[in-house]
Amino acid sequence: MAKVKYAYKEEDRSGTARASATHLKISPKHAVEICREIRGMELEKAKKYLEEVIRMERPVAFKRYNRKVGHRRGLNGWASGRYPVKAAGQILKVLENAEANAEYKGLDTEKLRIIHISSHRGPVIRGWIPRAFGRATPFNTPTTHVQIVLGEA
């Protein structure tokens, strides 16, 4: 597998911890909206927010990919939103991995803040579903790459 560089450039890595996940079977559009929402948050607040999204108690505002997205209660200053449960669960796992990396490096986990989080489209896993009369319909699965950098605030 090829070495993947981080989109975030840093000179001194002593005060930061990183984690990434590739080829996650989640929607790239949902991942972009979640990353935008938790970017800059403190680690504990971000984890709590993602857990609330998974329990469908708090929606994620869809600001870019919001065509035909219904309104949700609890969004301040924005109407359209959704509950991307699957994407929130996968991003939460990567966030917990970054926290474990920070703990291993000896950083104070109480002071950690998300200084960089990004998601990029990965390759599409091609598939198909057999249909009547010998035909087939494409059934593709999008993948997503996620990168997280935590730093002490």
From Swiss-Prot:
The gene is rpl22. CDD domains: Ribosomal_L22. GO terms for cellular component: cytosolic large ribosomal subunit. The keyword Membrane does not apply. Keywords: Ribonucleoprotein, Ribosomal protein, RNA-binding, rRNA-binding. The keyword Ribonucleoprotein applies. GO terms for molecular function: rRNA binding; structural constituent of ribosome. Coiled coil: none annotated. Belongs to the universal ribosomal protein uL22 family. This is Large ribosomal subunit protein uL22. It holds the Pfam family Ribosomal_L22. Gene3D superfamilies: Ribosomal protein L22/L17.
